[in-house]
């Protein structure tokens, strides 16, 4: 099917690749169907775009934690595992939402400014069932390694 995204333009969406967030994403509960896009010219994408198929104006920029030098371990409840229909840990993909901070004192151009990652509220997606959740309110411990 064709989809007209405000950010990505007119794109082709294979309906078998649609990711469902059964409860939506917090504050966007009405958006349950998403498509994950990336730059196909890059063998290992640095960034992904999660486009809502329920609202053409909603697109999130995402990155895999390891592309940002972050190692993630998340504990999921039995309810979350069931909701995702996970077959095992290897079936789960973790993605971090990227955003531009609203810093009025910054002199940089709003489009060219640095991105930050939301570490406390990652997305967890089952690769086999294509179901997702946003795991909210994580407390982050940072382990620093010295040379």
From Swiss-Prot:
Family annotation (Pfam families): FliW
GO biological process: bacterial-type flagellum assembly; regulation of translation
Main location, first listed in the record: cytoplasm
Organism superkingdom: Bacteria
InterPro entries: Flagellar_assembly_factor_FliW, Flagellar_assmbl_FliW_dom_sf
Keywords: Bacterial flagellum biogenesis, Chaperone, Cytoplasm, Translation regulation
Subcellular location: Cytoplasm
UniProt GO cellular component terms: cytoplasm
Subunit structure comment from the entry: Interacts with translational regulator CsrA and flagellin(s).
Family to which the UniProt record says this protein belongs: Belongs to the FliW family.
NCBIfam families assigned to the protein according to its UniProt record, in alphabetical order: PRK13284.1
Purpose of the protein: Acts as an anti-CsrA protein, binds CsrA and prevents it from repressing translation of its target genes, one of which is flagellin. Binds to flagellin and participates in the assembly of the flagellum.
Protein name from the UniProt record: Flagellar assembly factor FliW
Source organism of this protein record: Chromobacterium violaceum (strain ATCC 12472 / DSM 30191 / JCM 1249 / CCUG 213 / NBRC 12614 / NCIMB 9131 / NCTC 9757 / MK)
């Amino acid at each position: 099917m064709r989809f007209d995204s405000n950010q990505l333009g007119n794109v082709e969406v294979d309906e078998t690749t649609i990711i469902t967030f059964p409860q939506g994403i917090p504050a966007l509960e009405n958006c349950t169907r998403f498509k994950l896009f990336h730059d196909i010219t890059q063998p290992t994408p640095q960034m992904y775009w999660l486009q809502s198929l329920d609202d053409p104006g909603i697109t999130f920029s995402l990155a895999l934690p390891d592309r940002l030098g972050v190692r993630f371990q998340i504990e999921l409840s039995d309810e979350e595992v069931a909701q995702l229909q996970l077959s095992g840990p290897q079936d789960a993909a973790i993605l971090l939402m990227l955003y531009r901070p609203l810093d009025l004192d910054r002199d940089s151009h709003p489009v060219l400014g640095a991105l930050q990652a939301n570490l406390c509220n990652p997305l967890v997606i089952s690769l086999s069932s294509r179901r997702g959740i946003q795991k909210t309110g994580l407390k982050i411990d940072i382990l620093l390694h010295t040379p």
